[in-house]
Each structure stands twice: as C-alpha cells, then as structure tokens.
Curated annotation (Swiss-Prot), chain B:
Protein name: GPI ethanolamine phosphate transferase 3, catalytic subunit
Glycosylation sites: N268
Highest classification ranks of the organism: Eukaryota, Metazoa, Chordata, Craniata, Vertebrata
Coiled-coil intervals: none
SUPFAM superfamilies for this protein: Alkaline phosphatase-like (SSF53649)
Pathway membership: Glycolipid biosynthesis; glycosylphosphatidylinositol-anchor biosynthesis
Amino acid sequence: MKDNDIKRLLYTHLLCIFSIILSVFIPSLFLENFSILETHLTWLCICSGFVTAVNLVLYLVVKPNTSSKRSSLSHKVTGFLKCCIYFLMSCFSFHVIFVLYGAPLIELALETFLFAVILSTFTTVPCLCLLGPNLKAWLRVFSRNGVTSIWENSLQITTISSFVGAWLGALPIPLDWERPWQKQIAR
Amino acid sequence: MQKASVLLFLAWVCFLFYAGIALFTSGFLLTRLELTNHSSCQEPPGPGSLPWGSQGKPGACWMASRFSRVVLVLIDALRFDFAQPQHSHVPREPPVSLPFLGKLSSLQRILEIQPHHARLYRSQVDPPTTTMQRLKALTTGSLPTFIDAGSNFASHAIVEDNLIKQLTSAGRRVVFMGDDTWKDLFPGAFSKAFFFPSFNVRDLDTVDNGILEHLYPTMDSGEWDVLIAHFLGVDHCGHKHGPHHPEMAKKLSQMDQVIQGLVERLENDTLLVVAGDHGMTTNGDHGGDSELEVSAALFLYSPTAVFPSTPPEEPEVIPQVSLVPTLALLLGLPIPFGNIGEVMAELFSGGEDSQPHSSALAQASALHLNAQQVSRFLHTYSAATQDLQAKELHQLQNLFSKASADYQWLLQSPKGAEATLPTVIAELQQFLRGARAMCIESWARFSLVRMAGGTALLAASCFICLLASQWAISPGFPFCPLLLTPVAWGLVGAIAYAGLLGTIELKLDLVLLGAVAAVSSFLPFLWKAWAGWGSKRPLATLFPIPGPVLLLLLFRLAVFFSDSFVVAEARATPFLLGSFILLLVVQLHWEGQLLPPKLLTMPRLGTSATTNPPRHNGAYALRLGIGLLLCTRLAGLFHRCPEETPVCHSSPWLSPLASMVGGRAKNLWYGACVAALVALLAAVRLWLRRYGNLKSPEPPMLFVRWGLPLMALGTAAYWALASGADEAPPRLRVLVSGASMVLPRAVAGLAASGLALLLWKPVTVLVKAGAGAPRTRTVLTPFSGPPTSQADLDYVVPQIYRHMQEEFRGRLERTKSQGPLTVAAYQLGSVYSAAMVTALTLLAFPLLLLHAERISLVFLLLFLQSFLLLHLLAAGIPVTTPGPFTVPWQAVSAWALMATQTFYSTGHQPVFPAIHWHAAFVGFPEGHGSCTWLPALLVGANTFASHLLFAVGCPLLLLWPFLCESQGLRKRQQPPGNEADARVRPEEEEEPLMEMRLRDAPQHFYAALLQLGLKYLFILGIQILACALAASILRRHLMVWKVFAPKFIFEAVGFIVSSVGLLLGIALVMRVDGAVSSWFRQLFLAQQR
C-alpha cells in the first residue's frame, strides 16, 4: 500500500515538473515572440494554468483521499465554487503580504499579482485538491504532528518549500545585474 | 553584590569588543604620515643649475616670479557646471533653465573676449570632499586621508609645509577674509584677516556680506600681496535649499558681480584665481566621491595675456592640487615640500607672442623643478615610513633619472632640442602622474597584522558572549571568581606590556595596550570555562541558536559582504524583519500554541495533544503579525536613498517643514506631526493606566502626568517656530530666535529632570494600608435631618450600624497594637516595565526634537512596532515560574533588526554626506562657537537615536512575558459559566504575580539579565565582526572607501552607543530592583512596629 502510494507520488511530481517544462516550450508554437525573459508575464499565466490543470487531472485520476464520502452534484458544485473563492482569496492575501513585504503599491501591481497567482498555484491549489476547502484541515496539516498520510506529508513539504523558494527569490534583487528585466524593474 | 557583578561582567565583555574594534580600526583607517620638512629658497629641490631665466633677478626663488600678486577667490561648493558657459549655439533648443546654470556670465564673457587671458578648468577633487580637507589639499598640495574626515568640527593647525607658510616666510603680506576654518588651519599667518563664523549653514549671507564689506577697500588700499576671500553662501545655500532653489540663482549672481568687480580693479601684475573647493550632490550635500561632488570649477584670469592658445571647447580636466605648485612657481616661491600636484605647464609658456621653442623650454623647466621636488619628497617619505611600495618607487626613480638626464642634456646642447623637448615634457609629466597615483594608492594601505588581530579579538568576544550566555543560566555560575580572574590577568598583562615597552623605550600605544589587556584576560576566562563547564557538555549545546533564526542571521551577515546589499540594506532590513515576524507567527502555530487542542488532535488517533493549552487564539497572533508588517512597511516610506542609486527617489517627508513651499500642505503636515506627538503621549499614558501605575502618587508618575504634556507642548511650539521662522515679521525675529533657542533646551532639561526623578524614586506603586480601608469608603452619601419615611429608615439604619462597626474595629485595632496590619500594594506586577517605559519615553522626546518634524510619525511607529513585537514575542515565551528565565534568540535578533530598520526609517544612511548636520543647531541657532563636543553629541544623538532607544529598552524583552501573564489569566478566568465562582474567590488570589515572579527568584533574574545582555551583545558583535571581515577582505574593492569603510565606522559607533545604552538599561532595572527591595524592607519594618 505504502510503496504504491510512494510510486504514485513520484509520478505526480514528475508530471508536475514535466508540465512546467512544457509550459516553456509549447506556447512558442502558438504565440509569436514568446520567451521566458521577454514576455515573462504571459509565461507566468500559462505556467500557472498548466500546473493547475495537471493538479486537477491528477486529483481526479489518483484520488488520494478515497475516504471522502460520495456526495450529490450540488455538493460538488458548491465545493468547486468554494475552491475558486479560496483560490482568489489566497491570491489577494498573498498580494497584500507581498506589498507589506516591500513590493511597490501601485507600480508593477500586475507583476506582483501574477507572482501571487503563481505562488497560489504551487501552494493553495494542491491544498485545495487534497484537503478541499477545509481551513481546519489545512491548519492541522501545517502544524507539528498534524500529518496523517504520506500525501499530506508530501503536501506539507512541497508547500513549505514553495514559500521558502519564493522567499529566497527575493534575495538576489539588490545585486546589480544588468539584465533587461532588471533594468525594466528599476525604471 | 551580584547586581554589580552582572554589570561588571557585561562591561568587561564590552571592553573586549572595544579593544577589538580599536585594534582593527588602527590597522584599517591608516593616516598618512605628515612630514614637517620645509622647502626653502636657498635649497633647490635637486642638483643642477637653477632653471632658465631665474638667474640674477631679485625676489626670484626657484624660478622668477611671473605675478607679484594673486587674488584667490574661493567659492565654497562651486560645482563645475555652476561656472560652465551656457552655449546658445543651438538656436532651436531652448536653453535649460535651472537656477544654477549660466549665472556666472562674466566668466563666459571674459573667456570669449580675452581668450588668451583667461581659462576655465574642471578641477578634479580628491575625496573626502569636506571643506577642511580641501583647504589642506589646496595649500599643501597633498592628499588628506579618510580619517581626517571625522575631524571636520575640530580643525587643527597644518603642520606640513604649505603655500601660506611659504608666503609668510618670503615676507609677502597675506590678507584673508571669510570662512573662519582658516583661522584654525593657519593661526597667526595672515597680516590682516576678517574671519566670519562658518558653522551656521542656515545663514546664507553673513560671511559673504562681511567679505564684500572689506574686499574692495582692502584691494584699493594696496597693502597686500596675496588676497584670499573664501565665500560660503553658495555652500550654505546648497545645504539649506539644495541647488535647485531660486535662492541659489541669487547667490551665484552675487558671486558673478563680485568677480566682475574684481576684474575691473585688477592691475597688470595680478593673477585672479576663482576656485570651488568641491562640488555638491543634487541635494546640496557633499563629503563623498560622487561625480557631482568631485568636480569643481577653477578659473584663472590675468590682465596680461599668459596663455599661448585659445581655450578648448570642452574645459580641460586637471587635478585640484595642481593649483599649488603652479601658484608657488608663478609667485616665485618654493613648491611646498609635500606637494604631489603637477604644475599647469600652459601657464609658464609666456603669453601668446613668445617663441614656441622658448615657451616649451619654460614649461619643461617648471615641470622639471616640480619633478625634482616630488622626487625629493618621495625619497624623504619612503625613508621615514614603509608605506610606499618599493617596486613602484624604484620604477618611478628610474623614470625620473631618465627624464632628468634628458633634461640636462637638452640644456647643454640646444641643437636638436626642438625634437626632444616634447618627449622630455611627456616623461616629466608621466613621472609626476605616476607618483601621484602611487601616493593615492599607498595612503590607503593597511596594517594587515592589526586588522587580523582586531578581527580575531572580535570573533573571540563573540564566542565569549555565546559561551557565557549559555553558561549564565545554568546553576552555579561562578560570578565573582569568573570575573575577577580575567580582570586581574588583564591588568597583569597590561602592566607587563607597559613595563616591557618602558624597558626598551618604545612609545606606548594605547590601542595595543588595550588589545594585550583584552587577550590576557580572555585566555584565563576560556581556560576556566573549559575546566568548569565546557568539558562536561557536548559541544552542540554551545551553539544553541535554532535553525531558522540561524539562517536569517547568516543572511543578515552575508549582506555586509556585498556592496549592492549594503547600499540596499535600507530595504533588505524590513524584508528580513518581516521574515522574522512571519517566522514567529508560523512557529507559534507549528508549536500548537495558537489553536485549541481539539482542532489539532485527530480523534481517530486519540493522541493527547500539547501539554500546555494555547494562551492565545490564532487570530490574535496573526493580527499582531499583520500589524507589525504594516508598521514596518509604513516606516519604510520614510526612506532616504543612498547616492549610488540614481533611479531611487528619497522620501520628500524627510525634509524639515521649513523647506516646504505650500502653506496649506505645511499646516496639514504640522497638524499630523503634532497629532503623532499627542498619540505617542496618549499611548504611553494609556499603557501606564492599564497597568495602574499612573495612579501612583510617586514623583515620576506625577511627572508623566504633568511634565510629559509640557514637553510635548514645548516640542510642538518649537516645530511651529522652526517651520515658520522665515515668514516671521521682522519685529518678531528676536523673539522667535530667542524662543527657538530656549524651547529645545527646556524640553531637554525637563526630560533630564524626569529621568533624575525616575532614578531617585523608581518604585511606582500605590499603597493602601489597612484591611478595612476599602470598606470604610463604602459609607454612602451623608444623610442629615430626621428620617421622614420608611425608605429613609431602611437606608439610614444600616449606615449607622456599619459606622459603629467601623468605629469599634478601629478602636480595637488601636488598642491591640500587635494586630495584623495588611497592606495592599497595587501595580507591583509592572513596576519594572513601568520604569522602563517611562525612561524610554523621556529619552525619546529630546531625540525626537533633534530630527525633522515629520520623523515624529516614525517615532510613533517605532513605539507601536516595538509594542506589537513584544506582545508577539511574549506569546511565544512560556513563563516558567521558578526559573530559570530565558529570552529566546529570535526575540533578541528581531529586536536588533528592528533597531537597524529604525535607523534607516529615521532618514539615515551609513555614509558621511547623509549625516543630519542640522541637529547641531537644535537649541543653538547661532552655532556653538569654539565648542566641538556639544555639536558632535547632538549630531551623534540624532544619528544613533534608534540604537540608543532599542538598547536601553532591551530588558523589556525579559519583562514583557510576565506582563502579558495578566491578560492570559484574566481571559481564562472569565469563561461565561464561572463568573459566580470568580466573584466568590478572594481578590488577592486573583491578582497575578507578574513581574514579582522575577523578584521571587532573584538569582535567576540576574542570570537572565546577564544572559539577555550577552545575547544582545553577541548579535551586535557578529554584525561588527562581519563588517570588519568585509572591510578587510574587500580592502582593494572599488567601493571600499565609499561603502565598506563608512559602513564599518557607522556600525562601530553604533555598537558603542548600543552597548552603553544596554548597560544603562540593565542598570536601570537593577536600580528599580534595589528600590523595590528597600521598599519591601521598609514595609516589613512598618509591619513589625
């Protein structure tokens, strides 16, 4: 049982990574002038979409929380709507936190918001898929001794790593790299 | 006894740090050796005949004089573009109209009409661009080094050979008027002098008008050979308004008129020199080495033609020190001994009508004299010290011998000289430039041994802090022996070192003495620590900092090693602080202290969750965290840009209100500032009232009630005066200036008296004696006259009964003198922190006054932020009742980080041009006269205000969790169902012990204070260690003098201020503790009586 779970975990993560790689290459087939550095905003949107889609598909296919009861269609719809609201809420609250952390308030608001969206994609979406719109369960998973299954364990690790990675990404900002994107930010 | 030993131990650790800092500084910030040799007329700089044309002429020294008189007009901070001609040859483009452009039109006219008489140069200034260093360079021709930058206030007489000295020894009459810095630099050198005070940068006109009063009469009287006029108006205008203010145009036009007037009065044997000593930044400051600061204007004019060619389109760039040898030779004087400038050869060519060959020869002879002088200087200097690099020196000597031989050969065989002359000139110039470059590089050379020693000492001190902070809370920490042995050994080492030096008759170096004492006291401590404690424990316990905190600390330290990060530190610090805050919140959640356990325990698993229930709900900690982030972000709006980042714009809110133009906005801002002041006051009073200390009848609380509002009133009134002083009608000027002198002094005096009161009677409690005392008060409204109704009877009869009861009880107690007298003392639970908060508020008000008005908002945020942080930290620190008490590392780190963040948000930057010099005038609008320590103190207090406040407030980190205990208890004791029980319970049990828990375990209390002090010193210490390491590793970095050295100096001074503040804060807690003890003793005695 456990080995099986670990195998499935591995495949899901590989798929996620693969989808990110795909999001770099596929759009260049359809879009002109697409590159990560030049049109980074578009890429962020696409990447976020890809990862969300992969997460959803995997959730539907793998169904790690098999114990959940069967429910009616209206239940599912309200659940889905709730998930959407949660996702938006997390985007906005991340945006607020970024601004509190020092992102400019008015300039570059779109960039900041897209950053919030991509971070939400890597943190909130897996939580929503795995735990559903259930804040108490989230709080449980992200506290000591709160993890009950290997899926939750993986969720904990990936989510915390996403936050730490986003945090680390802020560190090289002051370095004086003469990159075009940095010049743009400076302007 | 133990109190004293805690303080002494901390002082000893501070001494170790100071010794390390001093040793490192002495190796890092080397001063140039100042040679006292002098050039003289009789002694030519080198072998060989005296140069061409000087033989047989009277008054000629090394060279025949070309001008008998010089007028030197020094316009302080005359940037090059202020004097640059504005060409209007592009007709379509409208000329850029900035207040400082094109105002010196007489220069342009002269350059166009008399191209062979005048020349404009862009003179390249060596940093530091402070006036005194520039004056030194402009008279000695040398290179004042970095360390001199600090002594701008206390200028001293120049000991090196200089132009003024040469002039006076040649019997020339030097008349000076202007900036009184010259008085200190050249005491008694002038035949006639008119000095005007230079320090008051707000005064644009006194110096200039004073000069103008004397300039033309002196010139017409003819009793002078060299006339120096040093105008300050432009510089002061830059400091006060910046170059973009209309006032600058006025000032420059005035200077233009001065130049015009001088040109009209010049005689044929006189040279006019108009020079700026340095430039200014776009804010009007100077001191650093940005392009705008180091480019100054230099303009030469002679009524006779001296230049062989017309001026080039773009003015030539020359080093500023070139003026020194040029002027010396033009006036027929020896070049000052230590000069490293290169003569401006153009001026020696002899006018437009001279022969090309003879003019080139004249140039070569001037250059050769100059080269001989520089070579002699290098020879003497390298014999005196080992500063100069031997290899380069050797190369230069070879170059010089070759050039000199060529020159001699040229003199002897005039045939074919025309071809070789240019090469000789080029060789001589090459030598002079090489020598100058070598000197510039070598005078920034370091003593690596001292730097390594200082760094090692700093590292060792940090290690001691870490070790002792772990050891201090373990039982049986041997205070006295541990302290006495190292101190004794230190003294022994110092005496031995001094004796050794005495026997071999070397000069005693205080820095080395301190280092020896530090090392010899450090080693026995380490040995004792190892023997007594360390060997029993695994090494892992020595490094107790938790992982995430360690990571954040490492990032903080890594910041010091990159110039980009040091420049961006103002933004990186709030980011790190925010990370700390979120880390604290997340950690609280992770530890399960935020949520009720039923949410966390899985019913399926059935495990019992956390042993101690959460003390707060999750929303509470989250609110604190978000509030803190918001405060940090808001404080970040008061951001001053470092000069390196051109795209960044400093916050306009940092400037004083007086510089604002709009009346309405000014009034609004003034209102906001006063509101911030009132809010600060109200917050402190509210806090004191919440814990009840405000009710105490003790003098400090009376002061808080009445003195603090008075201080706020004084501050507000001073701001009103300062922001509107320029608009005051002339009749009120005297009154306004008087009031702006008295008010800040009154506020500072009030604060000092408040602190004195606090030290005198720090125990702010309200004592109510007698058990029945509260009940006697329950007698209700008095009733007079006979009762008329049943209701009246119902009311009166119990009253009478109660009254009689009281009477009897009172009589009984009086007869039974041994009866138990109970005393109810209130607010004992917050007695320590009440004293701390009062002291911090009293400290904050004078510091607030030293800043610009709108910084008061930052001070309000500072108090709010530290309040929230203390609450957040207290939520995570469990109160262990019997002790030992500890303050966790994250608390101390966050506190230190917040101090740094506040340093930046109060508008400071760790560079010298960013120092708020205005602070020196608060309370002293007329300047200080000759006093130097007071302005230095005021400016220092302004710069390191946040370091001081946070260091003094450091003990609050220990006290706060005990304060918060009352909240937790109150909340828990009022569940809805148990209200009846709570009422039944006697009042005494309900009262939480709070800070009295600390008093119950004094041993642990002192150990915790010591540990807190050591931890704070450790955090500050590793910062200074990182700065020292960065400065020593990157000592050849391009940015070392611009970024790393100033950063190190600011960190070092900040460390000293912080450590003193920390000692004061802990001493205050000790004083309160002593007072509480004596209060208890008195109470005990009273009870026994």
